[in-house]
Amino acid sequence: MKPSVPSLLPSASRGLRALGVAALSLALNAAHALGAPLQSAGTLSFVDANTLVVADWRGSRLHAITLPPAAPGTSAYFNLKNVSAAIAQSLHTQPDRLRFEDMAVRPGSELAYITLSVDSGHGVPAPALVSVDTAGHVGVVDLKRVPHESAVIGDAPSADKHFWRDQPEATYTVTDMAYRDGKLYVAGLSNASFASTLRVYDFPFNGAATAASVEMYHPVHNQLETRAPIRKMLIADLNGEPTLVAAFTCSPLVTIPLRELKDGAHIAAKTIAEFGWGSAPVGMVMFDAGQGPMVLLTHSHKSADLMSVADIADAAGKPGVTTPIKWPAEPTLGLKSTYVPLAGLAHIANQDANLLAALRRNEASGAMELVSMRKGLFLRLSDFINEYDFADFKYGPKDPWRAAHGMLRTDEGYADLAPPKE
């Protein structure tokens, strides 16, 4: 058993840490570039309907791309079972040359924007940005010509450091972004010894930026951690205060009031939940499907966690989790969530008021799919074969599932298989 976690770090360590964070904040403020070329396209986030911020880990920059206006979209399902083939054709390459980096839905448009790395077979992969509509039409954004402004990411991780031999540490320079009231909040890594970093940029970019390092208590590992970055985050109003809600690998959930994000600060995040080991967050969205504001956290290797903002606020008002889990019988601690069967997603985003959009791999073919799911139901009926799917099955009178099955089968492109209405 590991020793108990100390409540305070040694003063010498805090001094070194403060120097490192101060140097990082100076580097962030040192440069502001207009229209720097994109060397990679990774994490992305919409600031508004016409402005998309793309993180460029190779170039150590953020790029705010101005998109031409888009016509308002009509709510419809994505039912694209091989979006990788359509994207590859538009980029004049093969599907196995594509690496899908991130996905976001343009507000009000029903258009999914996807960042990719395209491997030509020689040299550094090229960045790409495409849009996809619900009919499967792919639009390619010309990254060399599209209007954009750029901001430097100071003290990015070194390009020559790797995880597991071949994963550049610098790919985690930006892991997620969130916008609120003229500020862009950027999670990721720096090259400081306390590597987990939250950078805050004035937006539109004007050269002003701050940086704070982040530590959190990890109940699975039973230790304070200062290196592992935030993987997914969003901003919610908790108990009347704008607060960052953030998830880490393996899988603590923490809260950080935005007022604590001061330049050069070292933030002790409050751990409010432990959702279990052996997985990494891949998506976090907030929505109201008729039962009040909810947060859905999806993971790489386990079921998603659904929780109300009210419950998150209640947990944030308490002291927080400071003790380890009891492995393996009690893998969770703190805030309780509802398990939702959404394992295996690569990316998820709010599509509109009623739908979620998701990228996922087809288990049999390996093709990337772009699909929609209804908020509140969190499934695609056509993923499963069960009693209802046999040709001789008959719904009983007033069967509560008849209407839901009819709606979902129609949504997913199987209107001919929908049960007749009563």
Regions inferred by a protein language model and the residue ranges of each:
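Bacterial N-terminal signal peptides
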Residues: G15-N29
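Sequence/structural signature of beta-propeller domains
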Residues: A33-E422
